[in-house]
Amino acid sequence: PGGRPKYHAKKYKHQTDLLENDDIDAVIIATPDHWHSKIVVDAVKAGKHVYCEKGLTRTFQEALDIHDAVKETGMILQLGHQNRQVEANDKAKEIIDQGLLGPVNLVELTTNRNSQWGAWVWNIHKDANSKTIDWETFQEPSPNKIPFGSEALKRYFRWRCWYDYGTGLSGDLFSHDYDQLNQIMEMGIPKYASASGGIYFYKDGRDVPDVWHVTLEYPDRDMTVLYSATLSSNNSRGNRIMGHDATMILGGQSNAGGVGGFSVE
């Protein structure tokens, strides 16, 4: 953290101090999701270009705030979907653009994980306490505040399990697979969307689902996109683009095994 010692990288406790440094041209934001909007807006207004990890924001209003700030300042914003650099996605796009699959009417995207790590149940550091964690700053942008204590420690280290700080399966994992599809097929925004799910395995106080199912309808493309996820099974299913003449099976972006290639059947 803070860079290799020999380069004497300066450390900052708060982002406002860092943004006041005129020697900094761009920033990388890899905080929990609930801080993204404020830091992005502050950064572009301070004249810094921004690379921000997904999910970009927790709420639609936060996304609008970022849009307006970036447009107003003219700074560059890049969203951190790092799998855009996967060569297999470019090859898959070439195959589809050549029409080798024929008309595509159904796409299935999936996430399967089956470990505490994959379900964001991460260890609470033995030295974590009110002196080593600035809890009030951490929870500052969250809609619901709680006092520091055992519950706060759990939320600090496992923040992805609560919508106060993260975006759950939607922004954390589905966003990878949808971005992969968008890169390959340029889907854009669906006309209709519905989702359902629940907390069926990890009864640990979280409020984000551990099972989730999404249907996206693209009537102008004659296509339905399905996404299903579970955090209690490691049956890796991959992602399927099903055409009239052939089906393309892609390695899932957000499964525990990492990014794979693809096959055409």
Which stretches of residues belong to each language-model region?
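N-terminal Rossmann-like dinucleotide-binding module
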Residues: 1-6, 83-86, 96, 181
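Alpha-helical packing segments of well-folded alpha/beta enzyme cores
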Residues: 39, 62-63, 88, 177-180
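The substrate-binding groove and active-site-proximal loops of carbohydrate-active enzymes
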Residues: 49, 80, 167-170
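Short strand-turn motif at the edge of the Rossmann-like AdoMet-binding core
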Residues: 54-56, 80-83, 111
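Contiguous beta-strand/loop segments that form the cofactor/metal-binding neighborhood of enzyme cores
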Residues: 90-91, 103, 108-112, 117-265
